[in-house]
Amino acid sequence: MAKQKKHPQGTIALNKKALHDYFVEQKFEAGVALAGWEVKSLRAGKAQLVDSYVLLKDDEAWLMGAHITPLKTASTHVIADPIRTRKLLLHKRELDKLFGAVQQKGYTCVALSLYWKQHLVKCEIALAKGKKDFDKRHVEKERDANREVQRAMRSKGKDD
């Protein structure tokens, strides 16, 4: 028998901007329906989630704005669209929870990361609420204060 190839375990792409712009309330794991050339590109790490979001319509979830750059060696028979909409695969009860929250409570649904789970590509999506500018400044001040405390602790440890 042939030896099984090891698939890379780990993150393909992160959406750091989403963590900066939104308060993440709840996270979900969704499968992604991909074409063959897209999987090859993801193996090469050619993906961006910077301005991506999740559109909920007709009892389905769609990943919008995710950019997967096609490889030069991809198939010439298929015209590769790097920013096409991709279907997200979720359970019915998860979709119902997302629909209810997005329609009533002022939440939005954003993509946080793409990653490998064994040989499958998964997308971590989140139910999130938008941050205001003063919220972002407040988080920045907290980070700076924590950094100062860590510096003080490190320098105190060296003085002993």
UniProtKB/Swiss-Prot annotation:
The keyword Transport does not apply. InterPro entries: SmpB, SsrA-bd_prot, SsrA-bd_prot_CS. SUPFAM superfamilies: Small protein B (SmpB). This is SsrA-binding protein. It comes from Ectopseudomonas mendocina (strain ymp). Residues 136-160 are annotated as: Disordered. GO terms for cellular component: cytosol. HAMAP family: SmpB. Required for rescue of stalled ribosomes mediated by trans-translation. Binds to transfer-messenger RNA (tmRNA), required for stable association of tmRNA with ribosomes. tmRNA and SmpB together mimic tRNA shape, replacing the anticodon stem-loop with SmpB. tmRNA is encoded by the ssrA gene; the 2 termini fold to resemble tRNA(Ala) and it encodes a 'tag peptide', a short internal open reading frame. During trans-translation Ala-aminoacylated tmRNA acts like a tRNA, entering the A-site of stalled ribosomes, displacing the stalled mRNA. Keywords: Cytoplasm, RNA-binding. Belongs to the SmpB family. Its main location: cytoplasm. It is found in: Cytoplasm. One of its GO terms (biological process) is trans-translation. GO terms for molecular function: RNA binding. It comes from the Bacteria.
